[in-house]
């Protein structure tokens, strides 16, 4: 069964937001819809078919018995990458990429063997070892597990890489290119698409967007496993642990791309608003003057900026749960609610939209 998704899902996840116009890579020009508030807007009409190609490549690779390596070492991608790879019985690197991880697999294999040996020693209680020696082994295991835990069972170089943030993972991509391993990647407007076999133009920073990409790739891998088992003549119904089939949450979840596709004009319209609260690594365009909020002096605004809040639309999208968390994290002592920042922010957003 093909993996279905819609353009609306990409929009709601913020996949259409690129970077500030001055930070762009000119090679991404063909994938840019336009500019809004000095932010490049990615053409999701190209993202949708590109993602379909990447998903098909993943499914085909796994169906043929191949291995997919998820690569994403940035903070907001690390946990999501690991969860998606584990769920789909694939492999991942979510800590620092070690030089030679692909091109010097023999050395990496030696480190993996060491990890297994240390793990076995600790599991047996380390007979004959002093307390200090066991402590040293535990620390060594933690270090090796962090670096190699996601590939310790891979058994060889992968057959395809799925990458989040091609700028950060350049070394991984270069090694894959050197070995002729195809690469499917999320490519933002500030990235170089060279060396990517399956270019998926989309935002590579928003946590919600990253979660969507990883979920789709994981489902494609699971689809490949199902196809492989079906073609081998395996009776899935007779298995002691049959493959779990993920059902849509409702009848609308399996809608096809064509029936839910949005007009490109909607992309520009939604670029000015968002339906969910998120923290940003940097402002999208010029930051808003948050000192206009009741009781928000320069020091408080600096706190908000340091936490990743730069715009009124972020505050306007806050739920009561978001308000409580941010208030507690920044020690604002109830100021967000007390001074009605959310309603004020919504007013500023509406005024800007009407201008």
From Swiss-Prot:
Pfam families: Ribosomal_S2
UniProt KW keywords: Ribonucleoprotein, Ribosomal protein
InterPro entries given in the database record: Ribosomal_uS2 (IPR001865), Ribosomal_uS2_bac/mit/plastid (IPR005706), Ribosomal_uS2_CS (IPR018130), Ribosomal_uS2_flav_dom_sf (IPR023591)
Domain of life: Bacteria
Keyword field contains Ribosomal protein: yes
GO biological process: translation
GO terms under cellular component: cytosolic small ribosomal subunit
Disulfide feature: none
MF (Gene Ontology): structural constituent of ribosome
HAMAP family: Ribosomal_uS2_B (MF_00291_B)
NCBIfam families found in the cross-reference section: PRK12311.1 (NF008966), rpsB_bact (TIGR01011)
Family listed: Belongs to the universal ribosomal protein uS2 family.
PANTHER family: 30S RIBOSOMAL PROTEIN S2 PROKARYOTIC AND ORGANELLAR (PTHR12534), SMALL RIBOSOMAL SUBUNIT PROTEIN US2M (PTHR12534:SF0)
Protein name as it appears in the record: Small ribosomal subunit protein uS2
Organism: Methylobacterium radiotolerans (strain ATCC 27329 / DSM 1819 / JCM 2831 / NBRC 15690 / NCIMB 10815 / 0-1)
